């Protein structure tokens, strides 16, 4: 029998106008990011125009100040951004759907978040060029999308916390979040961690 998780949702009033917006499929995917990389990716997504087509040649700049404003330590932010610049090119997103071929099982699609990254030594600025595969999920969005103000992520120190908050934000209009524990395990890439449902709830 599947285990389910229900949460009642309360959101604080935002203090910034920068909005993260993407298709709901992103919430159901696994992401392979750490918290520093996530702050950079989400800061870049917040710059993508909502209602217009975007080329994969666009470069979105994220500064050290942007990352610090989301909760990164100011003394280590330059090293965090340099490390993130080295790692982001190899980070990917994995989408699982029912097989479209009529066969039983899942259809798994894996692609990179970005196709290029540029790091400016001494300035702590990173330029992000999103991959062509991710663009349909983060640009020209008209329906079935999740959105929240970037500043709502301030102080989160663990990427799974960001992920869970993002999943909940999808249902902010209803005030209730409902999912299976099995889905959380896949989306948060928990594997065999916290095998007991009660332990997962505590975490």
Question: Which residues does each PLM region occupy?
Answer:
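Charged, alpha-helix-forming regions
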Residues: 2-203
């Amino acid at each position: 029998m599947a285990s389910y998780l229900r949460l009642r949702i309360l959101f604080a009033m935002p203090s910034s106008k920068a909005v993260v917006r993407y298709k709901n499929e992103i919430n159901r995917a696994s992401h392979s990011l750490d918290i520093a990389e996530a702050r950079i990716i989400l800061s870049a997504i917040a710059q993508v125009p909502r209602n217009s087509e975007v080329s994969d040649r666009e470069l979105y700049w994220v500064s050290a100040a942007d990352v610090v404003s989301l909760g990164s330590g100011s003394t280590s932010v330059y090293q965090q951004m340099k490390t993130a610049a080295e790692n982001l090119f190899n980070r990917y997103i994995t989408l699982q759907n029912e097989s479209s071929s009529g066969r039983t099982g899942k259809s798994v699609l894996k692609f990179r978040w970005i196709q290029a990254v540029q790091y400016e030594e001494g300035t702590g600025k990173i330029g992000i060029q999103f991959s062509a595969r991710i663009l349909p999920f983060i640009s020209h969005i008209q329906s079935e999308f999740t959105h929240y103000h970037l500043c709502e992520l301030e102080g989160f120190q663990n990427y799974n916390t960001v992920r869970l908050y993002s999943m909940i934000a999808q249902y902010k209009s209803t005030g209730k979040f409902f999912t299976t524990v099995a889905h959380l395990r896949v989306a948060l890439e928990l594997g065999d961690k916290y095998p007991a449902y009660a332990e997962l709830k505590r975490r």
